[in-house]
Amino acid sequence: GVTGFGFDLVRYLFAGVVDGR
């Protein structure tokens, strides 16, 4: 997500969902 680039990357890689909360 826009408010969590770091988490966004992890989410995208593992979950495949762009949601960096």
Curated annotation (Swiss-Prot):
GO terms for cellular component: cytoplasm. It catalyses: 5-methyltetrahydropteroyltri-L-glutamate + L-homocysteine = tetrahydropteroyltri-L-glutamate + L-methionine. It is an enzyme of class 2 (transferase). The keyword Metal-binding applies. Its EC number is 2.1.1.14. One of its GO terms (biological process) is methionine biosynthetic process. Its cofactor is Zn(2+). Keywords: Amino-acid biosynthesis, Cytoplasm, Metal-binding, Methionine biosynthesis, Methyltransferase, Transferase, Zinc. It is found in: Cytoplasm. Pathway: Amino-acid biosynthesis; L-methionine biosynthesis via de novo pathway; L-methionine from L-homocysteine (MetE route): step 1/1. One of its GO terms (molecular function) is 5-methyltetrahydropteroyltriglutamate-homocysteine S-methyltransferase activity. Belongs to the vitamin-B12 independent methionine synthase family. Catalyzes the transfer of a methyl group from 5-methyltetrahydrofolate to homocysteine resulting in methionine formation. This is 5-methyltetrahydropteroyltriglutamate--homocysteine methyltransferase.
